[in-house]
């Protein structure tokens, strides 16, 4: 026992006299550890919160220490161990805004220039047509409800404008004006990340001219609006997510039941079935065959866009399968609590935060004496200055691809693409949906 005391003199031992087993996480088998000084011992991890690790020694005692007192290899092990631990996922039942609290103000109106600017708490949107008060409040409510939804879902998005105080949008009076303003051919709306702008023609959301102002018509719908706003809310995530996650999350939010400014997340299954019925009744191709996962998971943005341009049938498959995957990981996989999805976004989020820090370091670097920023955005600097380094995961296109492949393993959870697809088909069959 004296040798044990010498060996672990730097650890603080906590002897648990009576601890309910149900309160503790599953203890893993013992493994070999080393202190920072190189002393070896055997123990199992009981818990690690990122600051303090609790170990179970071979004699049953519990010991607490900080990672810095362990070897570099053991510190790396703890980081990976923590990533694998369950997250307490809180799935919201209903998310929305109180209509009475909605701020929807007129900033400016210019009938000659067809430019009407409106502002809500988090959005500023420019319309080519004047909105009546009912439509203005409805649009404002849906914009703000989408913001609240992205805050509440267990993805840790933390939506904020790409720049400035407000998310920006442009609404066009018809498709011709939409295309002339930079809209995407064949689309019902688009979020252009380079311009930080959501663009949509009135017809895509069911708005028509009534007298001298625009109002809702019988086809008023929110799917396109919510889909593209989701992209806008996730502006700072899009560079770190594969395209199937980018589009799948937007399809998922766009299908959630939305009534009077409230998304019913608990009724996501109703949205799923409505989506399937829409495909059956209102599209010529019907319900698409799922896109092969072994092709979908590694697809690049360039390859995705090539499919959209050249193959309408495969395009439908891409969006449909992306939605199926996100819905599955949110509601059907394992216990149906979105656990793997939350862990996936936590891992991606850690790198995104590192990239955000790098971006700020670069901004500060460019302000230093000896750095010259050119009109095209490029810059030169003196050789005695040290350029900030980006996170290794995003340093090169190859590193980014490797990072996406690594984080995919969180969702696969030891399954092959074929095994996952088999489980997906089985889960949807139980809902009455045959794929």
PLM feature spans:
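Acidic/His/Gly-enriched intrinsically disordered linker/tail segments
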Residues: 190-202, 220, 240-435
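Juxtacatalytic substrate-recognition/specificity segment
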Residues: 112-243, 259
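Compositionally biased alpha-helical segments
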Residues: 22-157, 181, 188, 276-279
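Bacterial N-terminal signal peptides
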Residues: 9-21
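Short, flexible beta-strand-to-coil junctions
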Residues: 58, 171-176, 330-334
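N-terminal secretory signal peptides that target proteins for export/translocation
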Residues: 1-7
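Extracytoplasmic/secreted envelope proteins and their assembly/folding machinery
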Residues: 30, 42-45, 75, 140-147, ...
């Amino acid at each position: 026992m004296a040798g044990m005391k010498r060996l672990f003199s730097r650890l603080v031992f906590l002897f648990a006299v009576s601890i309910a087993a149900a309160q503790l996480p599953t203890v893993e088998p013992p493994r070999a550890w080393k202190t920072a000084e190189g002393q070896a011992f055997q123990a199992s991890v009981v818990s690690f919160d990122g600051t303090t690790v609790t170990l179970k020694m071979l004699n049953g005692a519990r010991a607490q220490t900080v990672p810095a007192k362990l070897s570099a290899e053991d510190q790396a092990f703890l980081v990976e161990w923590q990533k694998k631990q369950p997250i307490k996922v809180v799935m919201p039942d209903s998310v929305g805004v109180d209509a009475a609290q909605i701020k929807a103000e007129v900033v400016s109106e210019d009938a000659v220039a067809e430019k009407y600017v409106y502002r809500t708490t988090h959005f500023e949107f420019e319309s080519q047509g004047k909105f009546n008060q009912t439509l203005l409040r409805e649009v404002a409510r849906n914009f703000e409800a989408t913001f609240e939804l992205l805050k509440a879902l267990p993805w840790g998005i933390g939506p904020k404008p790409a720049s400035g105080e407000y998310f920006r949008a442009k609404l066009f009076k018809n498709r011709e004006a939409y295309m002339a303003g930079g809209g995407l051919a064949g689309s019902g709306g688009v979020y252009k990340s380079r311009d930080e702008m959501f663009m949509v023609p009135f017809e895509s959301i069911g708005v028509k001219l009534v007298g001298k102002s625009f109002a809702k018509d019988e086809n008023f719908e929110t799917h396109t609006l919510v889909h593209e706003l989701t992209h806008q809310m996730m502006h700072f995530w899009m560079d770190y997510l594969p395209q199937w996650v980018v589009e799948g999350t937007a399809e998922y939010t766009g299908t959630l039941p939305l009534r009077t400014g409230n998304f019913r997340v608990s009724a996501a299954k109703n949205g799923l079935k409505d989506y399937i019925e829409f495909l059956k009744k209102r599209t010529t191709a019907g319900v698409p065959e799922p896109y092969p996962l072994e092709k979908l998971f590694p697809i690049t943005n360039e390859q995705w866009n090539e499919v959209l341009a050249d193959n309408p049938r495969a395009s439908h498959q891409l969006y449909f399968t992306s939605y199926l995957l996100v819905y599955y990981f949110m509601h059907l996989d394992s216990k149906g609590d979105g656990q793997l999805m939350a862990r996936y976004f936590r891992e991606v989020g850690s790198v995104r935060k590192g990239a955000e820090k790098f971006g700020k370091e670069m901004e500060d670097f460019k302000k230093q004496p000896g750095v010259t920023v050119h009109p095209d955005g490029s810059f030169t600097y003196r050789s005695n200055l040290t350029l900030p380094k980006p996170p290794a995961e995003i340093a090169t296109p190859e590193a980014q691809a490797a990072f996406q492949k690594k984080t995919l393993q969180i969702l696969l959870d030891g399954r092959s693409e074929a095994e996952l697809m088999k489980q997906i088909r089985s889960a949807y069959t139980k809902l009455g949906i045959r794929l």
